[in-house]
Amino acid sequence: MSSYFFTHFALHTIGTLGGVIPDFPWLSVSILFPIGCAFLIPFFPDKGEGKEVRWFALSVALITFLVTVGSYINGFDINNEDVQLKESINWLPNLGLTWSVGADGMSMPLILLTSFITALAVLAAWPVKFKPKLFFFLILIMDGGQIAVFAVQDMLLFFLSWELELLPVYLLLAIWGGKNRQYAATKFIIYTAGSSIFILLAALAMGFYGTEVPNFEFSHLANQDFGQNFQILCYIGLLIAFGVKLPIVPLHTWLPDAHGEATAPVHMLLAGILLKMGGYALLRFNAQLLPIAHAQFSPLLIVLGVVNIIYAALTSFAQRNLKRKIAYSSISHMGFVLIGIGSFSSLGTSGAMLQMVSHGLIGASLFFLVGATYDRTKTLKLDEMGGVGQKMRIMFALWTACSLASLALPGMSGFVSELMVFTGFVTDEVYTLPFRVIMASLAAIGVILTPIYLLSMLREIFFGKENPKLTEDKNLIDAEPREIYIIACLLLPIIGIGLYPRLVTESYLATINNLVDRDLNAVKNIPKTNVFAGNKSNQILKAPTI
């Protein structure tokens, strides 16, 4: 009851703020509030198991989520394709750096997703007893930093926000991870920090382009007439940087290692939010700011997306480690994001956006269940699991529901997003018919493999060859109320979006249509080839209004 009254009071307060203060800085508060509160955690007493810190972190995460919801309810117009909730302050004018935040259709769904997943990750971290103050300090820093990635409207500020989450993730892996945590954490920081240099170089090049006074704001960069060769150089660098985070094969090898050592709440943040930063950045920078280069590299994105789907699905099928199996499954599903971004239809690009939201929810749910299962069985080897279905019937039901969501069962969000990507790409006349048929047919292989490895995984965990150490363990318990609540919170939007996609798609249709129009203008100048259909690229397939 107390949580109900707290939520009701918070929503009432947020609504009041929106009415009384029309220019309330929603996004700045969403970013700075969790970061500022994180620096209060060191003042908490060290005694006990960190109960006060846990409740404080959960309260901060919930308030941050409610503030982001308030920003959507009170100040966001779904029919407006432009940046809204804009806040701009000259921060370091001599360096051309401004505190510029805002939200459009591409960023608002991911801002909401970030605050929602983080709040559930804090609840998932309830059993953490080792250094709880540092753990929740890092989680709250990540919360503000990841919201900033989606909200900032300045490329240099974007780079700083992108870098802000590196150290928290490194420490969360290196301190609370498994036995190979140091290797996984080091590999993560080498891949992500090393590739980030391309973001900085591209930001500096674009900000100083054609002027002695730098300007890194997205609105300015979008109106710059960058030359073709300049766009290609920036595009390649940004593709590498964002491809590491997405991740794109073969830049993916850090992810299975990171997931293999992470704890459940860190899993949720990695799969639910971190990977989406790469997909969002590809749309924001490569597709929106570099349209000429994007038109030339889009076929490569399609091919890379198909490679992601097939390679990762085959690799997941062969994995005997539960965490690594789900990690490769995530890589496979992110391939649909690449195909959607590479398509020149609003339907396909809208599907890519929906896939990011959908996979954020589904990936977080699966990895939370992986952590919950490991806490009980103390093993990740599928060969050592089995026969626990009779003792963990509720856990089996939760696993089944989330696995069905992952294999894109109709009525769940994954089905809608993948169908939109497939339909948008196949019916897109920008590409030649043979190219579309070949790529779609290859991608379908991965779609067929997904239910095979997921359902066989369920059978091995719960109904495989019995492990007497597990089946006879009196301490092997079924799902707890906290765990059921977390999965229920994730399944509710998964099913809701699957039954009524407009819950999400309406928020970004205007922005996506504008983006695709911009890219199609660049495609018109590309001659007919074995991949491009030439003059047929004047058409645009609008996203659905279902």
From Swiss-Prot:
GO CC annotation terms, alphabetical: plasma membrane-derived thylakoid membrane
Chain ranges passing through the membrane: 24-44, 56-76, 108-128, 132-152, 156-176, 188-208, 232-252, 263-283, 297-317, 326-346, 352-372, 396-416, 437-457, 484-504
Protein family membership: Belongs to the complex I subunit 4 family.
Organism: Prochlorococcus marinus subsp. pastoris (strain CCMP1986 / NIES-2087 / MED4)
Chief localization: membrane
Protein name per Swiss-Prot or TrEMBL: NAD(P)H-quinone oxidoreductase chain 4
Protein's cellular compartments: Cellular thylakoid membrane
GO biological process: ATP synthesis coupled electron transport; electron transport coupled proton transport
Keyword NAD in annotation: yes
Pfam name, any one: Proton_antipo_M
GO molecular function: NADH dehydrogenase (ubiquinone) activity; ubiquinone binding
